[in-house]
From Swiss-Prot:
Its biological purpose: Non-catalytic component of the 20S core proteasome complex involved in the proteolytic degradation of most intracellular proteins. This complex plays numerous essential roles within the cell by associating with different regulatory particles. Associated with two 19S regulatory particles, forms the 26S proteasome and thus participates in the ATP-dependent degradation of ubiquitinated proteins.
Places the protein is found: Cytoplasm; Nucleus
Organism, as annotated: Danio rerio (Zebrafish)
Keyword line: Cytoplasm, Nucleus, Proteasome
Family the UniProt entry places it in: Belongs to the peptidase T1B family.
InterPro entries with a match to the protein in the record: Ntn_hydrolases_N, Proteasome_bsu_CS, Proteasome_sua/b, Proteasome_suB-type
Entry-linked SUPFAM superfamilies: N-terminal nucleophile aminohydrolases (Ntn hydrolases)
CC annotations in GO: cytoplasm; nucleus; proteasome core complex
Summary of subunit composition and partner proteins: The 26S proteasome consists of a 20S proteasome core and two 19S regulatory subunits. The 20S proteasome core is a barrel-shaped complex made of 28 subunits that are arranged in four stacked rings. The two outer rings are each formed by seven alpha subunits, and the two inner rings are formed by seven beta subunits. The proteolytic activity is exerted by three beta-subunits psmb5, psmb6 and psmb7.
Descriptive protein name: Proteasome subunit beta type-1
Observed phenotype of the null mutant: Morphant larvae have a strikingly smaller head compared with controls, a mild degree of edema surrounding the eyes, and a significant decrease in head/body length ratio. The eye size is significantly decreased in the morphants compared with controls.
Domain of life the protein comes from: Eukaryota
Length: 237
């Protein structure tokens, strides 16, 4: 029931007076969830992501992987604001085509990482809301992982997780691959089969606890034979 105090003597609704100026806020960003992960081995690299695209408590798509093939030896994983992910990958793909036409060869993983750093830094005052991880092979055929922050700072890692479930995945990777703070443990070289199984296991665990991660897992395995893809189902609730 509407109170009679809201109306004046002429029957029209009174104007409300605010104590200060009214601000019209607009946020150009949205967080669309999702998790990406990359692991580098002796002669291979793995980049994996889930396929859920969500915002708040709404799921926009169950088939939106966040792994993008850039060259035959490089895969980009990015999560954050999906619009910025699409824009950024289109810019990178255009730069790669220009480089190939000019030099008659594909850009290496390290060169792509350096290029991506300059692209992100160029937008530092209005940054892309994207967390990027590059996985691939370096010039010597060894696995390489490069992780970035939104404004272009990057470093080479052996393994890295990013996105909504990164706080859950990174400690598991530290334990199983990095052997952090572990004594009397034999550091066995990571095989491709073990790495793939580990990636599947940690994503299955993350999907149990993170509402923004789920539906399916896309795994891209980069080796000298090329890029092999696998799809693993995750929980869909």
């Amino acid at each position: 029931m509407i109170s009679a105090q809201a109306y004046g003597e002429n029957g029209k609704m009174k104007e409300y007076h605010y104590t200060g100026p009214v601000e019209h806020k607009f946020s150009p960003y949205a967080f669309n969830g999702g998790t990406v992960l990359a692991v580098a081995g002796e002669d291979f690299a793995i980049v994996a992501s889930d396929t859920r695209l969500s915002e708040g408590y709404s799921i926009h798509s169950r088939d939106s992987p966040k792994c993008y093939k850039l060259t035959d030896t490089t895969v980009l994983g990015c999560s954050g604001f999906h619009g910025d992910c699409l824009t950024l990958t289109k810019i990178i793909e255009a730069r790669l085509k220009m480089y190939k036409h000019s030099n008659n060869k594909s850009m290496t993983s390290g060169a792509i990482a350096a290029m991506l750093s300059t692209i992100l830094y160029g937008r530092r005052f209005f940054p892309y809301y994207v967390y990027n991880i590059i996985g691939g092979l370096d010039e010597e055929g060894r696995g390489a992982v490069y992780s970035f922050d939104p404004v272009g700072s990057y470093q080479r890692d052996t393994y890295k997780a990013g996105g909504s479930a990164s706080a859950m995945l990174q400690p598991l990777l530290d334990n199983q691959i990095g052997f952090k703070n572990m004594e009397n443990v034999e550091h066995v070289p990571l095989t491709q089969e073990k790495a793939v199984q580990l990636v599947k296991d940690v994503f299955i665990s993350a999907a149990e606890r993170d509402v923004y991660t789920g539906d399916a897992l896309k795994v891209c395995i980069v080796s000298k034979e090329g890029i092999k893809e696998e799809i693993v189902p995750l929980r869909k609730d």
